[in-house]
Amino acid sequence: GTRFMATKEAGIHQNVKEKMTEADELSTNLMFRTMHNTARVFKNSISDQVVEIESTGSATFEDVKDLVAGQRGRVVFEEGDLEHGIWSAGISVARVKDVPTCKEMVSRLVSEAEEIIDGRLQSVKA
């Protein structure tokens, strides 16, 4: 899902897509761990606040609900304000380096898989 967010066809603001191309392995936060409902989101000031609130050890959803409200995330996706709310992003966001079409991205994925199979996994290829 994360990789498809950064495609030309994805209906989210270009700012989000461009920010994803700048990401690295440290660009996500795990939230709601203390509430046993872990979510990985893109690291920004809002997700940092949620993680900080949770670090007290006694946080409840009531303590963070205004920060994580869906309407705030909608503003991120529709208006491109990257610090307005949280937005889901998997660790694979670190591998996003461009914003291709879906067709280009899937073709590249297939080509890369074939290279791995033909190159490194030749002995297991049927």
Predicted segments with their positions:
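Conserved active-site-proximal phosphate/metal-binding subdomains
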Residues: 2-126
